[in-house]
Amino acid sequence: MYKALNPWAIGVKVPIEQCVELAKKNGFEGIYFDVRWAAQVGPAKAKETLAGLKPAAFGLPFNYSCETSDFTEKVLELGKLAAAAEAIGCTRSSTWVPSWHEEMPYDENFMFHRRRIQWIGEALREHGISFGMEFLGPKTLRDGHKYEFIHTMSEMLRLCYETGTGNLGLLLDCWHWYTSGGTLDDVKALKPEQVVDVHVNDAPPGIPLDQQKDNVRALPGETGVIDVRGFLEALESIGYKGPVMAEPFSKRLSEMPPDQAVAVTAKAIESVWP
């Protein structure tokens, strides 16, 4: 596995060229990118811009819960965008899955996701790209909603298995692993191909597990509430070879100058690196 920079996740909003420069300066091996940018500029220019950094992964470029007519159109476009990602050597894409719904009960929502994710998985598979889905662990995200949905690792793995395209796995975020009550043994039981993408961060101290709020986090290693090093060691032990990025939702970080924000993030990841 390797350290990758996601500039948007730490509030850095500068051109990709500057992001690449900051990533290389601070020891990152890869960078997350906008797949539409890669398609627009073409593979030669994209590779030149990345300057040797690995193209870590790209987020699914549309909301898969859209209207059926829009979804069909967007999946067709996804094939073209995936070809652009393939051309620069990217093999990973990911998105998050809401842990609630106001209209669909669990089983109905599960079938909806199976159908939609099958289309997405097949479109990406044509270009050698794996698709990671993030379950959301916090109970506070489900509170106040009519129906609960997937919010644990085992449930998400079931969706991957039952959808059956062969290229589906987890976007495994240690925050959601922690808030869902996950254990290191759960991580150690995974196969490397079941993990597509990895996010790390920490949680504020003194807050019960079922009261942790999704958008109140910390940099990895900042508080020690989450055993981030143990989490990464478990991933290393199963042979995970993909990117690891920080997603701290930190107001303090987002208010820093870009060069400082990237440097602080790199130092935080290094502090928990196996």
What is each PLM-predicted segment?
Residues 1-27, 44, 51, 83-84, ...:
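Histidine-acidic metal/acid-base catalytic patches
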Residues 55-59, 137, 211:
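Short, basic/glycine-rich phosphate-binding loops at helix/coil junctions
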